[in-house]
């Protein structure tokens, strides 16, 4: 069903529909690049520029008006060659963070994505801590951001932003200090447990993706996608889509906003439909993350 869940004492299970995507994928003729959402992406160590590129490219392909990437200095040339539409700021490993620039970037953004390819280095952790402490718009935490938080939950102390966690089952197991098998027994329960523990919305990625929200036994079960999504970089793409949708939600008037959980569920649904579209053009075995991004055009 394609509507927000009501207040119920018993667990609620629902899903979103393709028509629900119109609010994020349809543009008003009177808008501009600022009103369609500005997304800040903190991603990419020196060895993982591709994660930053895929995430940022997915942001723009999902309808956001602008994207800025904060990445390691060694990624400067490959980033601009791969994605000339992006703006960027840079940090250097084992050097002080560019805090003034980061504060300006965070104030500029309507949503922030942190983690794809970031690494778990000392400087990457400092960057994540600084971001968490100074972000007031929706914050999507993925990949290495989740791995760092699993090792040190205090990273999130003092966070004022709404949070969306996007773990695959391995990352979820680390976040909950459980085994993968334990996390797979009850997908909704494990997603809900992470949402409660980290006071966030949790998108538990697996063959069936489940989205849970803190404080509510309400679960969105994703109905799109296929094994085509099981490819390197696919999670970076989902993080970008989620950031774009969260930014668009942030730009909406309060009376029109949907829940953060439904926003995240819609991103997972769009990701799945894009994978389906990519699979139709080749086969599940040959789909790449870049093709998933191109598949967004067919939704």
Regions inferred by a protein language model and the residue ranges of each:
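Small-residue (G/A/S/T)-rich helix-start motifs and N-terminal tracts that mark the onset
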Residues: 1-138, 143, 147-164, 169-299
């Amino acid at each position: 069903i394609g509507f927000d869940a009501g207040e119920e004492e018993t667990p609620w299970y629902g899903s979103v529909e393709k028509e629900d995507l119109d609010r994020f994928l349809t543009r008003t003729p009177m808008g501009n690049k600022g009103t369609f959402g500005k997304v800040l992406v903190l991603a990419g160590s020196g060895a993982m520029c591709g994660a930053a590129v895929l995430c940022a490219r997915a942001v723009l392909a999902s309808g956001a008006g602008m994207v800025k990437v904060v990445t390691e200095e060694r990624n400067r040339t490959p980033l601009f060659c791969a994605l000339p539409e992006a703006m960027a700021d840079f940090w250097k490993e084992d050097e002080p963070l560019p805090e003034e620039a980061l504060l300006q970037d965070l104030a500029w953004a309507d949503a922030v994505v942190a983690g794809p390819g970031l690494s778990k280095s000392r400087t990457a952790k400092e960057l994540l801590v600084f971001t968490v402490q100074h972000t007031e718009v929706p914050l999507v935490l993925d990949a290495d951001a989740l791995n760092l938080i699993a090792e040190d939950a205090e990273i999130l102390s003092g966070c004022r932003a709404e949070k969306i966690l996007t773990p695959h089952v391995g990352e979820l197991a680390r976040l909950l200090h459980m085994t993968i098998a334990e996390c797979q027994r009850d997908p909704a329960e494990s997603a809900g447990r992470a949402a409660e523990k980290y006071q966030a919305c949790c998108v538990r990625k697996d063959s069936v993706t489940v989205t849970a929200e803190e404080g509510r036994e309400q679960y969105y079960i994703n109905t799109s996608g296929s094994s085509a999504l099981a490819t390197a970089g696919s999670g970076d793409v989902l993080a970008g889509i989620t950031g774009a949708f969260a930014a668009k939600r942030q730009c909406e008037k309060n009376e029109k906003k949907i829940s953060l959980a439904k926003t995240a569920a819609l991103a997972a649904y769009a990701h799945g439909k894009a994978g389906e579209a990519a699979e139709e053009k080749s086969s599940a075995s040959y789909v790449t993350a870049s093709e998933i991004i191109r598949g967004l055009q067919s939704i």
